[in-house]
Amino acid sequence: MKVSLVYGLTCFLDATSSALPSAMAAANSESSALEKRNDGYLVMCKNCDPNSGSCDWKQNWNTCVGIGSNVHWMVTGESNGQQGCAIIWEGSGCTGRSTTMCCPGDTCCNINTGFYIRSYRRVE
């Protein structure tokens, strides 16, 4: 099962590497609104600095977002904001086969091949 998950994640990253720039550009316009609301969000990017918090592609909690063809992801979080998780779905929409990756609050986690997820504490 581990081999399958690692293989699936590798395929996911391969499939999204070309889609990331456009996805990040589309999300940049919403980042300030997310910060002003003090809402929880998770970030995925190629470069992540855990000290400065620099990263792009912020996304609301509990929303489904398509990245490239047949790849979707959804951000979830615990109510205490201690970690953020990205559920990666294979197929159209956030249904069917999926893999979950989590990252502790306010940290920068390398998930594979230079991609990172960074979760922020959710402010209730």
From Swiss-Prot:
Record carries keyword Membrane: no
GO molecular function, one term: toxin activity
Localization (cell): Secreted
SUPFAM superfamilies, alphabetized: gamma-Crystallin-like (SSF49695)
Keyword Chaperone carried by entry: no
Protein name in UniProt: Killer toxin
One cellular component term from this protein's GO annotations in UniProt: extracellular region
Annotated function: This toxin kills sensitive strains of yeast.
Entry keyword set: Cleavage on pair of basic residues, Disulfide bond, Secreted, Signal, Toxin
Signal peptide positions (record): 1-19
Subunit structure as annotated in this protein's UniProt entry: Monomer.
Disulfide bridge positions per record: C45-C55, C48-C108, C64-C94, C85-C102, C103-C109
Main location group: secreted
Pfam families according to UniProt: Yeast-kill-tox
Propeptide residue range(s): 20-37
